[in-house]
């Protein structure tokens, strides 16, 4: 099912974007790629031998969550930043970009699936650790999206924006008043705004034919903050702190998870579940399909842990 945020593109439109970005190029083959639910993504083979990816963002008429505004340019920012500051981490090269679309090189490999490719997961952990050495200018998102002078302020703003979006979309959430504020002190222990990918679920991690890490894609949701936030999506719907032999952790090599770290991880799962619940209507997902109730159950479990 196509998400309401994904524009329907013809090959002619893709060729027009390529001409705008790359000039006079001949397209010998092009096809839409599946897997995402936000933008529309095509793969194109050019007569000069290059294979590229064309990503086109939502139409201006599409309703988006607050933090999603401007994410197509943000992806270009992320790729350029990583290639400049962490060149050993495989991300696409940006060939051209605008406010509405981005053209990048095509990375080899296939998305992670299930429990396969432990070597790729280990190498992913090491790559993310390298990315976390990059320090940002502030906490939170870039532009006029939620951010703050410190991590407690920024994180509270991020969650508050999602709650406001949920209210606007009439998406029910469990009571959340005061939860973030009660844990101000553990959040305040984060003093450096590290570069975070945030969206490290299996579909955004590419595996080479030999089983190693081939690439990270879809960095448009990046922000700056606590490195622990990036430890949530690699073990989606699970508690990675309870899986010490998880290959991602063996590659990342975090400090031992003390009580404060476990509390922060619980807060970051809360954030992810609030986001996933809230984005349902914008993606055309019916509340009756079971997803809303499943995510609400996970969210309530984290709330019980947080007290």
Segments and roles (model prediction):
Residues 33, 160-161, 189-191, 221-224, ...:
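Helix-rich C-terminal or lid/interface subdomains of diverse kinases
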Residues 31-156, 165-167:
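ATP-binding pocket architecture of kinase catalytic cores
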Residues 47-49, 99, 209-212, 270-273:
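Short strand-connecting beta-turns/loops that link adjacent beta-strands
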Residues 9-25, 108, 117, 130-198, ...:
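An alpha-helical support segment within catalytic cores of ATP-dependent transferases
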Residues 11-12, 73-76, 242-246:
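Short, surface-exposed alpha-helical segments at coil->helix boundaries
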Residues 34, 39-45, 53-54, 94, ...:
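Active-site acidic catalytic loop and adjacent metal/ATP-binding pocket
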Residues 2-6, 60-70, 285-291:
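Short, flexible/disordered intra-domain loops and linkers
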């Amino acid at each position: 099912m196509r998400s309401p945020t994904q524009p329907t593109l013809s090959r002619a439109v893709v060729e027009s974007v390529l001409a705008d970005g790359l000039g006079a190029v001949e397209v010998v083959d092009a096809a839409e790629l599946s897997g995402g639910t936000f933008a529309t993504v095509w793969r194109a083979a050019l007569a000069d031998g290059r294979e590229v990816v064309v990503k086109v963002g939502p139409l201006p008429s599409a309703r988006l969550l607050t933090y999603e505004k401007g994410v197509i340019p943000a992806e270009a920012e992320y790729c350029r930043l990583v290639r400049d500051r962490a060149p050993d981490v495989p991300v696409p090269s940006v060939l051209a970009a605008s406010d509405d679309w981005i053209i990048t090189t095509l990375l080899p490999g296939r998305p992670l699936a299930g429990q396969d490719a432990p070597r790729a997961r280990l190498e992913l952990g090491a790559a993310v650790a390298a990315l976390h050495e990059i320090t940002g200018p502030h906490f939170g998102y870039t532009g006029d999206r939620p951010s703050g002078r410190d991590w407690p302020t920024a994180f509270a703003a991020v969650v508050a924006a999602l709650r406001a979006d949920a209210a606007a979309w009439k998406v029910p959430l469990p009571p959340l008043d005061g939860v973030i504020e009660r844990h101000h002190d553990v959040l305040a222990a984060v003093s450096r705004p590290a570069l975070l990918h945030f969206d490290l679920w299996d579909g955004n991690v590419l595996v080479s034919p030999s089983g190693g890490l081939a690439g990270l894609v879809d960095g448009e949701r990046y922000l700056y903050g606590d490195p622990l936030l990036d430890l949530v999506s690699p073990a989606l719907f699970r508690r990675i702190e309870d899986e010490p032999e998880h290959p991602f952790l063996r590659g990342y090599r975090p400090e031992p998870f003390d009580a404060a770290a476990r509390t922060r991880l619980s807060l970051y799962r809360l954030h992810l579940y609030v986001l996933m619940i809230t984005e349902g209507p914008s993606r055309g997902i019916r509340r009756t399909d079971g997803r809303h109730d499943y995510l609400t159950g996970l969210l309530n479990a984290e709330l019980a842990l947080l007290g």
